[in-house]
Design a protein with these regions (language model features):
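A short acidic (Asp/Glu
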Residues: 15-16, 42-46, 95-100, 188, ...
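Short, high-confidence coil segments that cap the C-terminus of an alpha-helix
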Residues: 28, 80-82, 104-105, 195, ...
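N-terminal anchoring/stem segment of glycosyltransferases
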Residues: 1-82, 153, 248
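Short polar catalytic/cofactor-binding loops
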Residues: 7-11, 112-115, 231
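GT-A fold catalytic core of metal-dependent nucleotide-sugar glycosyltransferases
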Residues: 68-121
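Short, flexible, basic/aromatic active-site loop/helix in glycosyltransferases
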Residues: 122-139
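Catalytic core and acceptor-binding pocket of nucleotide-sugar-dependent glycosyltransferases
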Residues: 137-240
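Short N-terminal binding/cap micro-motifs at the start of the first secondary-structure element
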Residues: 11-16, 117-118, 235-236
Length: 248
């Protein structure tokens, strides 16, 4: 298993919990980070914590989109095609258990377990990027783009397709922040070319928490990865104290 992430303009305070939580799981695989506009102190911090830091002097497009193309390049450059890779956001991801046990050709977790049409943010993202496909997608359960896991050769192709599709989307200025582009493009691909690779069985790999304020604490137990926990006022403290829980 390889962990692959990307960031820019974050401090140690922003990513420290991500770095330390993975370390606390006992993860022994490779850890690779793409770092745009690098600062020497942050490079040193990451390298001291066992990360391979791949730096870029600029980020021509919005990072959530640009990272997909650069992740694909890196997978091929580092010959990671046969590895299982966990591609994640960095600031709001917490590892409770080592992800090395997750061996899926392609895994995406549901955003909030509701159809795209029932979520205003996902609806707007798809309507902006792919208005002609909204009718086809509106009753599909939205996938979250913050954590994507799979075999390297599949992810490299997925990310290349993601980049080409996004360049031709309805988002007109993708050098500026356009947070809906990444996730809407992931959903278009997930429900078309890559649908046959996805496992729709219930699992406890990743929990996306932004819209789970009404969830009971007992329903949070046992996941490998928690995403967007900082947005969840009710359960944030539960997540940040996970390494003290007896069931992990």
């Amino acid at each position: 298993m390889v962990i692959l992430t990307a960031f820019t303009n974050y401090s140690k305070d922003n990513i420290g919990r991500f770095v330390s939580s993975l370390e606390q799981t006992g993860f022994t695989g490779r850890k690779i980070v793409i770092y745009y506009y690098p600062k020497p102190s942050m490079v040193e911090y990451l390298e001291n914590n066992g990360w391979e830091v791949h730096t870029y002097g600029n980020c021509p497009l919005f990072i959530n989109f640009q990272r997909r193309k650069d992740m694909s390049k890196l997978i091929l450059e580092y010959k990671l095609e046969e590895e299982y890779i966990c591609c994640t956001d960095i600031r709001d991801v917490y590892f409770a258990k080592t992800p090395s046990d997750i061996k899926e050709d392609l895994f995406l977790g549901y955003d909030d377990n509701s159809p795209i049409a029932n979520n205003e943010w996902n609806t707007q993202a798809v309507k902006t990027g792919y208005p002609s496909l909204y009718k086809k997608l509106k009753n599909k359960i939205a996938f979250n783009a913050g954590v994507i896991i799979g075999k390297g050769k599949i992810l490299a192709e997925f990310f290349d397709d993601h980049y080409e599709l996004g360049l031709n989307s309805g988002y007109t200025n993708i050098s500026e922040p356009c947070p809906g582009l990444d996730q809407s493009t992931v959903n278009v691909l997930a429900y078309s070319k890559y649908k046959h690779l996805l496992s729709f069985k219930e699992n406890k790999y990743v929990l996306h928490m932004a819209n789970l304020d009404n969830t009971e604490e007992s329903q949070l137990e046992g996941y490998y990865i928690y995403h967007q926990y900082e947005r969840n006022k009710k359960h944030k403290e539960y997540v940040v104290n996970l390494n003290k829980k007896s069931y992990i």
